[in-house]
Amino acid sequence: MVDLFLGKVLVKNNKDRDELDTEREIILRLQNRILMLFFGSGDSEKCQDFAPTLKDFYKKLTDEFYVERSAQLVLLYISLDSSEEQQEKFLKELPKRCLFLPYEDPYRQELGVMFEVRDLPRVVVLRPDCSVLSPNAVSEICTLGTDCFRNWQEGAELIDRNFMMNEEFDEGKMRSMTDPIRRIKYKVEDEKKKKKKRDDDDDDDDGGGGGGPWG
C-alpha cells in the first residue's frame, strides 16, 4: 500500500494542512495499516449523507477519547469534487485525522480508474500489501459500524506493532532490573572458583616431595 503513494504528497485535514511529502513520512503513516480510500464529492447528496457516519466510524476507532490505542487504520479522501472550493468545503465534514490528495494532483482520477469507481460514495478498503479487502465498504460501515473493522483486521493479518513495542519495552525493563543482580551473582561465583583453584594449587605444592617420574 505504501508503494501506491510513494512520490505523492498527502495532506492532513487539520488546520495547518500539514503535508507528508517524504518517503519516510509516507512509510511511517501508511505501513502496516489498513487503508480506506474514500471516493466522494461534496456535490453528491449521498456523499453528504454518508459523511457523518464515516466521520463517527473513524473517530471511534482512532480517537483516544473512544479507544485506548488508535486502530491501525488510515482514511484517505480521494476527491472527485467539481472544484477546489467544493473539496475544501466537503473536507470540513470529514475527520481532522484523515488525509487527502491535493486537488491539483491528477492521481485522484487515476485512482478512480484503477479501482473502477463508477458511483459515489465509495470506500475501497486495502490491506497493507495493496490487495483489496473490500471493493466498497459503505454498506458495511453503515450496518455494522466499528465491528466491521475487526473483520478487516483478521482478513489483513496485521502485525500489532503497539503490542510488539510494549513487549520489547517490558523485556528491556526486566533485563535492566535483573542485570545488576546477575552480575553480582556471577562475580561471587567467579571469586569462589578462583579461591578453590588457589586452594587446589596449594595442596599440590604441599604434597609434591619428588613424586615426578624423573624425581
Curated annotation (Swiss-Prot):
Residue span of region Disordered: 190-215
A biological process from GO: photoreceptor cell maintenance
InterPro entries in the record: RdCVF, Thioredoxin-like_fold, Thioredoxin-like_sf
Gene3D superfamilies linked: Glutaredoxin
Domain Thioredoxin: 1-164
Protein species of origin: Danio rerio
Keyword GTP-binding appears in the UniProt entry: no
Function in brief: Plays an important role in retinal cone photoreceptor survival. May play a role in cone cell viability, slowing down cone degeneration, does not seem to play a role in degenerating rods.
Any one GO cellular component localisation term in the record: photoreceptor outer segment
Keywords: Cell projection
Name under which the protein is recorded: Nucleoredoxin-like protein 1
Broad class of where this protein is predominantly found: other
Transmembrane stretches, start-end: none
Coiled coil start-end: none
UniProt-annotated location(s): Cell projection, Cilium, Photoreceptor outer segment
Similarity remark: Belongs to the nucleoredoxin family.
